[in-house]
């Protein structure tokens, strides 16, 4: 499977939509946009081809579903009927776009050195990121949006699965509701897990649809956590960060796990290596 074949496959699978396609050969991207208002999304074909080797048709099904929902929600409609319970926070990498394609600033806040909090209108099977142009229609201020979103994320179910590896306990929150990573903002939930931990508590949001919490009880646990975060980071549809965070009494601190049972707090040399790796990953996508 190459990018041209993937382009053709996606165009065939999306032929039921009233959209146009624009293929960029140099960047290996496919833009899919509505014919009525030209709103759409751009897909990096190279990244999908890489994932196709492992996931086969499953990754195509995921992309088609994602495009279906996104295109449907891009129809021009009023936001006046949106209720406060539909305002949610979403976690993104600090490198995520700060403005819409039309140049309108998104509403967002800094979170950690690796993550930022954006805000969205929940639309059922998808959501729409809130930008400054939407505030008037929503009849909300930025502060009200922040408060509503944090209130709503705390109401989400926090069910999880656990796994023990070499004496270390790992918790996986993977409800696939679009807000798994957002649960990192639920301090009460994190404190609840912290109270159960016997070792150092680490937290990770490698992509949008998973939150990993680890109770690191021995040195092997750091290596396992590093492997897990990188594995999830490279396979997520919306990658966030491959870095883990130390968690203590409501405070998150990014750490870099060097491998072979070592870890290092964030310093300039570590930052340079991380940024170099991230640029390479984004280029490969």
Swiss-Prot record:
The record's InterPro entries line, in alphabetical order, gives: DUF1444 (IPR010838)
The similarity annotation says: Belongs to the UPF0354 family.
> Could you identify this protein by its name?
UPF0354 protein SAB1603c
Its taxonomic placement starts with: Bacteria, Bacillati, Bacillota, Bacilli, Bacillales
């Amino acid at each position: 499977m190459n990018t041209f074949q993937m382009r053709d496959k996606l165009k065939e699978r999306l032929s039921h939509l009233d959209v146009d396609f624009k293929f960029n050969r140099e960047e290996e991207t496919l833009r899919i946009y509505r014919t009525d208002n030209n709103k759409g999304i751009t897909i990096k074909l190279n990244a999908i081809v890489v994932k196709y080797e492992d996931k086969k048709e499953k990754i195509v099904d995921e992309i088609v579903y994602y495009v279906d929902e996104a295109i449907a929600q891009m129809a021009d409609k009023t936001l006046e009927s949106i209720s406060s319970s539909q305002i949610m926070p979403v976690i993104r990498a600090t490198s995520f776009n700060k403005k819409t394609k039309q140049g309108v600033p998104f509403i967002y806040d800094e979170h950690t050195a690796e993550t930022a909090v954006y805000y969205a209108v929940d639309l059922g099977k998808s959501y729409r990121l809130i930008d400054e142009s939407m505030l008037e229609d929503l009849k909300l201020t930025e502060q009200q949006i922040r408060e509503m979103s944090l209130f709503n994320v705390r109401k989400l179910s926090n069910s999880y699965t656990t796994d023990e590896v070499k004496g270390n306990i790992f918790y996986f929150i993977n409800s696939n509701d679009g807000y798994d990573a957002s649960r990192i903002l639920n301090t009460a939930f994190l404190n609840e897990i912290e109270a159960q931990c016997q070792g150092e508590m680490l937290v990770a949001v490698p992509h949008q649809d998973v939150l990993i919490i680890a109770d690191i009880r021995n040195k092997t646990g750091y290596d396992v956590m590093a492997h897990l975060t990188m594995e999830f980071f490279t396979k997520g549809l919306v990658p966030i960060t491959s870095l883990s965070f130390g968690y203590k009494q409501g405070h998150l601190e990014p750490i870099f796990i060097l491998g072979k049972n070592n870890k290092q707090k964030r310093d300039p040399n570590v930052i340079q290596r991380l940024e170099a790796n991230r640029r390479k990953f984004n280029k490969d996508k």
